[in-house]
């Protein structure tokens, strides 16, 4: 269940962008062709003390052999518990698990958020 902080973050990110947004951003550390939207940029800049680590993880994982093969649709979901533990999973468009990682601390808001990656573009579900 999303906390108020997570709900507010998602709402503000959605206000910051819209479906069909044409402006995309690139990070030179990511594989060629990987971009992200204004909404994703907002989340990375405003979640907790900043969630650049999350965007970097999704972006750089696009070079991983298992992830690279699924360019049509990827779903990246982050869960954060009350204890501040986190789990990040990647599924293909048919919801088959492709990759997972977890950790014992994050300042990302408690709750759940999902991103789509389609043809190398990382976006919020509302931007799809």
Regions found by a protein language model. Give the residues of each.
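Short, compact, well-ordered microdomains
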Residues: 88-128
């Amino acid at each position: 269940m999303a906390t108020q902080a997570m709900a507010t973050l998602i709402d503000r990110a959605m206000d910051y962008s819209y479906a069909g947004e044409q402006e995309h951003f690139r990070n030179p550390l990511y594989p060629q062709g990987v971009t992200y939207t204004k909404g994703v940029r907002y989340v990375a800049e405003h979640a907790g003390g900043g969630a650049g680590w999350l965007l970097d993880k999704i972006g750089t994982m696009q070079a991983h052999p298992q992830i690279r093969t699924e360019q049509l649709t990827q779903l990246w979901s982050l869960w954060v518990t009350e204890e501040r533990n986190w789990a990040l999973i990647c599924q293909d468009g048919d919801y088959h698990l492709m990759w997972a990682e977890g950790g014992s601390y994050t300042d990302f808001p408690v709750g759940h958020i999902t991103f789509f990656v389609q043809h190398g573009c990382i976006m919020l579900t509302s931007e799809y």
